[in-house]
Amino acid sequence: MNTGRGVGRVVVLSGPSAVGKSTVVRCLRERIPDLYFSVSATTRAPRPGEVDGVDYSFVTPEAFQQLIDDGALLEWAEIHGGLHRSGTPARPVREATVAGRPVLIEVDLAGARAVKQAMPEALSVFLAPPSWEVLERRLVGRGTETPDVMSRRLDTARTELAAQSDFDVVVVNSQLESACSELVSLLVGHTSAGTNPA
């Protein structure tokens, strides 16, 4: 049902591992009650504290392949050199935008490019660290990956940082509150089909 607000704004959020995407997303969900947060399907194992259907939809590789075969994903990609796959279910995103809700899609770099290609009206936002040193410290401090996986994540982060100019907006996550406020403005301050102020 359309709320009369026009089509909801779609913001595609990306950035390197450990830049604080999950923390920023939690802040946005608290500050924007009507926000539709796209829950990605993934074949990776849950991290401590992650909830199936809330943080991600954790699926088997076979179930993920079926989603691809059915054309049910807006985008999908192999992550960190093929360690796992992740993708965005298309139908819930489209339903939320038609209902006039702001939509947040958190994806990796390849996913952001694919969503932007499929939905050119979406606003792509890169969440950047204050510096490489801060990002490296955050990644290593997590302690959730093996040294080999950590090396891959650092390589991926370098690639992603180099591509931030491909995004519509770059938000530096030096302080949570300012990063969250900037993203709130982007999500609720714009609609792709709203009234034009006189």
From Swiss-Prot:
SMART domains in UniProt: GuKc
Record has Nucleotide-binding as a keyword: yes
Pfam families, per the entry: Guanylate_kin
Enzyme class: transferase
Protein name from the UniProt record: Guanylate kinase
Keywords: ATP-binding, Cytoplasm, Kinase, Nucleotide-binding, Transferase
Family: Belongs to the guanylate kinase family.
Major subcellular site: cytoplasm
Cystine bridges: none
Stated role: Essential for recycling GMP and indirectly, cGMP.
CC terms in the record's Gene Ontology section: cytosol
EC number, UniProt record: 2.7.4.8
GO molecular function, one term: ATP binding
Xref: InterPro entries: GK/Ca_channel_bsu (IPR008145), Guanylate_kin-like_dom (IPR008144), Guanylate_kinase (IPR017665), Guanylate_kinase_CS (IPR020590), P-loop_NTPase (IPR027417)
Keyword Glycosyltransferase applies: no
Subcellular location: Cytoplasm
Entry binding sites for ATP: 15-22
Domain Guanylate kinase-like, chain residue ranges per copy: 8-188
Reactions accelerated catalytically: GMP + ATP = GDP + ADP
